[in-house]
């Protein structure tokens, strides 16, 4: 007789507390800073140029032959481990306009500029990637389109569970 492997529900089902974060509007930077008790940092780990993927080009209504500038970072709250892996995709056309500022922000969060005195248009989708639950947002900001992908990592989910357990005590 074959032994059944246990099914890990948390891998396939969405925790209600995490769902709130995946569908929250506004600045994730501000929300993570508040959750972390004022602690928040950005650690860029990769910046490069690449051709738009077919899916991304369709979502932004641009030719897939266009080049984009990609910035990948880890977002930290009050933990030593990163909470979020962020990937921002800026088509070259957007970098020739106001969005060029994002190429030069270093370890500053995109949200600091994106939500400053404006509320950009945002289309959002939520997907499950191997690294974790992910929200992908296609922003239109001052006429510039770009994608910000935020994957909530296991350390963030663990922090949410700890916070939830504290509230129950």
From Swiss-Prot:
<feature type="binding site">
    <location>
        <position position="110"/>
    </location>
    <ligand>
        <name>substrate</name>
    </ligand>
</feature>
<dbReference type="InterPro" id="IPR007440">
    <property type="entry name" value="Chorismate--pyruvate_lyase"/>
</dbReference>
<dbReference type="GO" id="GO:0006744">
    <property type="term" value="P:ubiquinone biosynthetic process"/>
</dbReference>
<dbReference type="Pfam" id="PF04345">
    <property type="entry name" value="Chor_lyase"/>
</dbReference>
<keyword id="KW-0670">Pyruvate</keyword>
<comment type="function">
    <text>Removes the pyruvyl group from chorismate, with concomitant aromatization of the ring, to provide 4-hydroxybenzoate (4HB) for the ubiquinone pathway.</text>
</comment>
<comment type="similarity">
    <text>Belongs to the UbiC family.</text>
</comment>
<dbReference type="InterPro" id="IPR028978">
    <property type="entry name" value="Chorismate_lyase_/UTRA_dom_sf"/>
</dbReference>
<dbReference type="GO" id="GO:0042866">
    <property type="term" value="P:pyruvate biosynthetic process"/>
</dbReference>
<feature type="binding site">
    <location>
        <position position="71"/>
    </location>
    <ligand>
        <name>substrate</name>
    </ligand>
</feature>
<keyword id="KW-0963">Cytoplasm</keyword>
<keyword id="KW-0831">Ubiquinone biosynthesis</keyword>
<dbReference type="GO" id="GO:0008813">
    <property type="term" value="F:chorismate lyase activity"/>
</dbReference>
<dbReference type="GO" id="GO:0005829">
    <property type="term" value="C:cytosol"/>
</dbReference>
<protein>
    <recommendedName>
        <fullName>Probable chorismate pyruvate-lyase</fullName>
        <ecNumber>4.1.3.40</ecNumber>
    </recommendedName>
</protein>
<feature type="binding site">
    <location>
        <position position="150"/>
    </location>
    <ligand>
        <name>substrate</name>
    </ligand>
</feature>
<keyword id="KW-0456">Lyase</keyword>
<comment type="pathway">
    <text>Cofactor biosynthesis; ubiquinone biosynthesis.</text>
</comment>
């Amino acid at each position: 007789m074959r032994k059944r492997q246990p099914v890990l529900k948390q891998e396939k089902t969405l925790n209600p507390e995490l769902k709130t974060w995946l569908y929250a509007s506004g600045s994730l930077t501000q929300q993570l800073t508040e959750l972390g008790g004022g602690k928040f940092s950005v650690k860029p780990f990769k910046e490069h140029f690449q051709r738009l993927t077919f899916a991304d080009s369709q979502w932004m209504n641009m030719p897939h032959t266009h080049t984009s500038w990609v910035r990948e970072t880890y977002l930290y709250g009050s933990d030593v481990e990163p909470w979020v892996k962020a990937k921002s995709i800026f088509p070259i056309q957007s970098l020739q306009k106001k969005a060029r500022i994002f190429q030069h922000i270093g370890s500053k969060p995109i949200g600091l500029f994106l939500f400053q005195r404006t509320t950009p248009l945002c289309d959002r989708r939520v997907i499950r990637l191997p690294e974790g639950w992910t929200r992908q947002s296609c922003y239109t900001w001052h006429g510039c389109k770009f994608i910000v992908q935020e994957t909530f990592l296991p350390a963030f989910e663990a922090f949410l569970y700890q916070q939830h357990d504290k509230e129950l005590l």
